[in-house]
């Protein structure tokens, strides 16, 4: 009888952060592709674009003028998804038509004045300033709101509407779905195991190594065992840290290095500006101890086979459960095989 081999046979993997299963079909990686293809950006961007709403010194669509900033620049989104003064929604006992008010704010973080440089092309010093800005925004907004979501959508394939490298921070008066799910499942694990889920997970991955993509003194980036997206990664501190605001100076500067190495490997994989959505999850600002939480960042890139072929979450994924072709170990191996020095910086 044929023995099960995860490299050859379909199987499911459990994501303890979401409580959901992922169908892995490694034998499908060899199938031919005749579907839609992305058009990778090949245009060389200038360091400053006079028509860009985010460049230093330019006027935005609202008429407000950006300062001549030299590092990061933060402003309230001109088309914010949340407002701080939303009135209370009327209460309803209808179990099928429930509604609640949502308050908050949405801000834009310009990573640097350089219109042409994404995260992997910035210096470690510039990336350290970005991490500091993430910390400052999280600390400020956490005084008012229970959940602060820092994130970046990189590339048109991920819906980014402006090519100037930037991220966002949204603060919510509520715990969003993903955060609520992670909070509940980490809490349940902590109650059962008396240790934080992702602290235990880091130790498992450090001992294994097959899914490691980047390791620095204080940080580990892996393709998680339960990855859904082809080259999805999870970036975690090696020690117990609740929030990004709790990082030491050493952890912060080392995080900048880890970010540069990880995003450089992404770009080097297909020699392109690798699109992704990424964001930070940490303990909510709810007045509790939250020892079950561990700070971490998710990177969700859509590309699958090349710079032009992406993964689509459709059909079976929408109606049944998420499916992937590459195993997490195969994806990590491919990312490890490329340099962590960006191809534009290495001269390759």
Where do the language-model regions lie?
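A contiguous, surface-exposed recognition patch within enzymatic or periplasmic domains that forms
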Residues: 242-251, 255-260
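Active-site microenvironments that recognize anionic phosphate/pyrophosphate groups
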Residues: 1-164, 170-242, 250, 264, ...
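Acidic/histidine-rich, metal-coordinating catalytic segments
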Residues: 278-282
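Extended C-terminal subregions enriched in glycine
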Residues: 254-273, 277
């Amino acid at each position: 009888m044929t023995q099960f081999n995860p490299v050859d046979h379909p199987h499911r993997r459990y994501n303890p952060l979401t409580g959901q299963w992922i169908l892995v079909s490694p034998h499908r990686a060899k199938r031919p592709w005749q579907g839609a293809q992305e058009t990778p950006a090949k245009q060389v961007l200038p360091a400053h674009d006079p028509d860009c709403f985010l460049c230093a010194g330019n006027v935005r669509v609202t008429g407000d003028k950006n300062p001549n900033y030299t590092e990061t620049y933060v402003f309230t989104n001109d088309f914010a998804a949340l407002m701080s003064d939303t009135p209370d929604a009327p209460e309803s006992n209808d179990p099928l038509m429930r509604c609640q008010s949502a308050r908050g704010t949405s801000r834009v973080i310009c990573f640097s004045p350089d219109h042409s440089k994404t995260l992997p092309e910035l210096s470690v010093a510039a990336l350290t300033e970005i991490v500091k800005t993430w910390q400052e925004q999280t600390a400020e907004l956490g005084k008012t709101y229970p959940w602060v979501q820092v994130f970046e959508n990189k590339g048109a394939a991920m819906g980014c509407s402006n090519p100037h490298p930037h991220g966002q921070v949204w603060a919510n008066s509520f715990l969003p779905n993903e955060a609520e799910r992670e909070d509940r499942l980490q809490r349940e694990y902590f109650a059962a195991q008396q240790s934080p889920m992702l602290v235990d997970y880091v130790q498992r991955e450090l001992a294994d190594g097959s899914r490691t993509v980047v390791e620095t003194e204080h940080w580990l980036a892996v393709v998680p065992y339960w990855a859904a997206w082809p080259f999805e990664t999870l970036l975690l501190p090696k020690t117990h840290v609740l929030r990004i605001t709790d990082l030491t100076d050493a952890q912060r500067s080392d995080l900048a290095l880890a970010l540069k190495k990880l995003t450089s490997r992404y770009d080097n994989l297909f020699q392109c500006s690798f699109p992704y959505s990424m964001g930070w999850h940490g303990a909510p600002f709810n007045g509790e101890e939250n020892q079950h939480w561990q700070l971490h960042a998710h990177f969700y890139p859509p590309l699958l086979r090349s710079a032009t072929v992406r993964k689509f979450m459709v059909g079976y994924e929408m109606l049944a459960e998420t499916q992937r072709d590459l195993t997490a170990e195969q994806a990590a191996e491919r990312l490890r095989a490329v340099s962590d020095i960006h191809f534009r910086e290495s001269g390759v």
